[in-house]
Regions:
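An alpha-helical repeat/solenoid feature that recognizes helix-turn-helix modules
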Residues: 2-21, 45-67, 83-108, 127-153, ...
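Long, well-ordered core segments of solenoidal/helical folds
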Residues: 21-40, 68-85, 106-129, 148-169, ...
């Protein structure tokens, strides 16, 4: 049985944590703890509690050994109107519910995977990434949501998003993007098996500095695109063309968190997640 995307992410994050020395781990842990809201949940860059950021924070807390107050987290989750969320935030909400349930019940993912959770009808969402329910990124979010809640995963048709160089989030688009290609490859890997010849397109997108650009026209590589690409390549057991170690380290800030690009001076739990994910995928 193939591990879910969430389990693969956690395993990769754990490897990222294991790659840190004691001092580095303490700095990252302190930063993640600083992003916790007193009332439960994690904050965005502006300091406001946010369910999207909370999903990253809870995954980080799990691999860093940060003990969360599950009662406060329950209170926070119960305040959220799940029926009013868009797809991305709803998937984050359901992942948070799953992680908090696991923390309270002390059961593993294998036991949790036996339990099916009801979810909203997928057609009930009015907002999708790229305004397209069928794009690779939207389908990746849906696939992960269905896995997390142990609901049947569908066959996904992505041929209209395929280009000569990879995948795009626009039907019949011309320029492949890193994140659309990584999303498409993760869906194909989960549903059809991880054939490493499929990942060569993604491998070819790497910049010689070690990072990946979001799109060919983007001025510079960023940490999110790099982490998602490296994670996907690791799932396919494909080695990147260039070492990404120095690129990742350049995004680690004195605060203990990671920045989106080398031009950014602030961090949050989302990009700290991507920093550790990238390290774990090396």
């Amino acid at each position: 049985m193939t591990n879910t995307i969430s389990i693969k992410l956690l395993n990769c994050l754990a490897r990222g944590v294991q790659s840190l020395g004691d001092e580095a781990r303490q700095r990252v842990t302190a930063f993640v703890e600083s992003q916790l809201s007193a009332g439960g949940g994690f904050c965005d860059k502006s300091g406001r509690r946010d369910i999207y950021y909370t999903s990253f924070g809870m995954l980080l807390a799990l691999v860093l050994g940060i003990k969360l107050n599950t009662m406060r987290m329950d209170d926070y989750l119960q305040q959220i109107d799940a029926d009013d969320l868009d797809l991305v935030h709803y998937a984050a909400y359901k992942r948070c519910c799953m992680l908090n349930h696991l923390a309270k019940s002390k059961v593993g993912f294998a036991v949790k995977a036996l339990q099916r959770e009801p979810i909203r009808e997928l057609t009930s969402f009015t907002a999708y990434p790229n305004n397209d329910m069928l794009s690779p990124y939207s389908q990746f979010i849906i696939y992960s949501l269905l896995e997390d809640t142990n609901n049947p995963t569908p066959q996904v048709a992505l041929s209209s998003y395929r280009t000569a160089d990879g995948y795009t989030n626009t039907p019949n688009g011309q320029a492949a993007s890193t994140n659309a290609t990584a999303a498409a490859l993760m869906i194909k890997g989960q549903s059809e098996g991880y054939d490493n010849t499929e990942a060569i397109l993604l491998r070819n997108m790497q910049h010689e500095c070690g990072g990946f650009k979001a799109e060919p026209s983007t001025p510079m590589p960023d940490l999110l695109s790099t982490a998602t690409a490296l994670f996907t390549l690791s799932c396919y057991n494909v080695t990147p063309q260039y070492s990404a170690s120095e690129f990742i380290e350049a995004h680690w800030l004195d605060s203990g968190g990671f920045a989106a690009t080398i031009l950014d001076s602030e961090s949050d739990v989302e990009y700290t997640f991507y920093g550790l994910l990238a390290l774990g995928a090396l």
